[in-house]
Amino acid sequence: MIEKYKNILITFIALAAIVFLVGCSNKKTDQVTDKKINVVVTNSILADITKNIADDKINLHSIVPVGKDPHEYEPLPVDVQKTSKADLIFYNGLNLETGGNAWFTKLVNNANKKENIDYFPVSTGVEVIYLEGKNTEGKEDPHAWLNLENGIIYAKNIEQQLSKKDPVNKDFYKHNLDKYVKKLSDLDQQAKSKFSLIPENEKMIVTSEGCFKYFSKAYNIPSAYIWEINTEEEGTPDQIKNLVRKLRATELKSLFVESSVDNRPMKTVSKDTGIPIYSTIFTDSVAKKGENGDSYYSMMKWNLDQIYKGLAK
């Protein structure tokens, strides 16, 4: 009988030990998972650049949904929650998220986050282009990522802050950055070579919003537009009339319309000038997953290819 109770006791102790060890193992696993830093970015373009560098080493949340306008946005409760718990926050800067309704400023202030401690502009180091005739702070053209050289600056700034916040993975981040920079740089050089072949009198990119100034400077292609920035009036009769008048004096073969804006004003321009809309292109957002342009690299490649084909046809 005593021997029987002994065996039961030994079995009980063994089971208790197994439960304890499994519990410790799960706790360690949870601790490893919890070591991932929480990163919040303001839009899908920054999310993709960050993902290329950090991969699965971080918990990543992007605020403005794919296809939506980051100029003026109303954060959802989940955005507020993720921002308050974020270890690191990346935003474009250049008045993109802080102009208009200043949604980002309100978001980080309410979360008690501090600039250059908790949140960082990825555009630091970019040569700023301003809205026409407005060379003052708060009047920056924010669309710097449409020049691949600036996309590389964004990536380097993101890697720098990731490595500071998470030094355990800094070699991983740097390795991924180097690969990504080469990929973007190769595409940039290919584009410059192709656009140099187009006759000067056929070079002009016409879009709805005047968001291609950085692109124009990078690839030596003049730009024209209906309205200058999405936070102002969009597609008024006078704006359309002024662009139509300008285009009638050109030999332009193609117009373009952005994926994130109403295409009706550009359709009116096309009808009044006889110049066809060649393609939709990407500006403020990548495409939906699985579609052409669903990453920063692929949206830029799409833009470069479509604009080249439209101008060279």
Swiss-Prot record:
Lipid-modified residues, N-palmitoyl cysteine kind: C24
Protein's cellular compartments: Cell membrane
High-level lineage: Bacteria, Bacillati, Bacillota, Bacilli, Lactobacillales
Where along the chain is Zn(2+) bound? H71, H143, E209, D284
The record places the lipid (S-diacylglycerol cysteine) at C24
**Functional note:** Part of an ATP-driven transport system for a metal; probably for manganese.
Q: List the signal peptide residues.
A: 1-23
Organism from which the protein derives = Lactococcus lactis subsp. lactis (strain IL1403)
Keywords linked to the UniProt accession: Cell membrane, Lipoprotein, Manganese, Membrane, Metal-binding, Palmitate, Signal, Transport, Zinc
Q: Its topology with respect to the membrane?
A: Lipid-anchor
What is the name attached to this protein's record? Metal ABC transporter substrate-binding lipoprotein
Report the GO terms under cellular component: plasma membrane
Q: Which GO terms describe its biological process?
A: cell adhesion; metal ion transport
Q: Which InterPro entries does UniProt cross-reference here?
A: AdhesinB (IPR006129), Bact_metal-bind_prot9 (IPR050492), Lipoprotein_PsaA-like (IPR006128), ZnuA-like (IPR006127)
Q: Which residues are connected by disulfide bridges in this protein? A: none
Please provide, alphabetically and separated by semicolons, the GO molecular function terms listed in this UniProt record: metal ion binding
**Family in the record:** Belongs to the bacterial solute-binding protein 9 family. Lipoprotein receptor antigen (Lrai) subfamily.
